[in-house]
Amino acid sequence: MKTSAQQLLSALLLPLSVLAAPTGSIEARACSDVTVIFARGTTETGTLGTVVGPPFLAALKSALGSSSVTMNGVDYPADVPGFLQGGDPAGSQTMATMVTSTLSSCPDTKLVISGYSQGGQLVHNAAKLLPAETTAKISSAVIFGDPDNGDPVQGVSADRTDIICHAGDNICQGGSLILLAHLTYGMDTTAAAAFVKKAAGL
């Protein structure tokens, strides 16, 4: 028989066990109208970075409604050696895998592939790793400060591709200098969100 102290402890711990219960299975079944797979730039922290990822997500939520968009960041080193290789190879594969798994679990979502700086390299690389029948399902591709500026995103038509490069951005010119022009793409996120919305037909 439980003592009153044991009963009290059980009563106190029960709410904690409910809070700690995994909710992933419920969340996994909830597919957004728009899903963005985003790769951050070199040396940025987290998976969304700071220069473009967060303001782009905010702009998308404003344009589409907070319940209609999900942004998933690519987990990769985002280091200088990866940039010099033309985009981290493992990160590029990770992004391609995320595209495949997202379309498998949420076939009706409007899938967007996006990246900033080295993240743009990952967008190009991931698209090349995917079969044509998969890239045909990508709603749009959006790249900010693209080191591969001028190159198409394989399998994504030009009218569904938005590559944003500022005048004076050395990275967009094929260089490796980080100048002010490369650090101000947050200002372009509202227009980019409008592009995503139009491409998705929403």
Curated annotation (Swiss-Prot):
One GO BP on record is: carbohydrate catabolic process
**Disulfide bonding pattern of the chain:** C31-C106, C165-C172
Effect of disrupting the coding gene: Decreases cellular carboxylic ester hydrolase activity. Does not affect penetration of the cuticle of gerbera flowers or tomato fruit.
Gene Ontology terms, cellular component aspect?
extracellular region
Q: Which domain of life is it from?
A: Eukaryota
Up-regulation conditions: Induced during infection. By contact with cutin. Repressed by glucose.
What is the protein named? Cutinase
Q: Provide the species name.
A: Botryotinia fuckeliana
Q: What taxonomic ancestry is recorded?
A: Eukaryota, Fungi, Dikarya, Ascomycota, Pezizomycotina
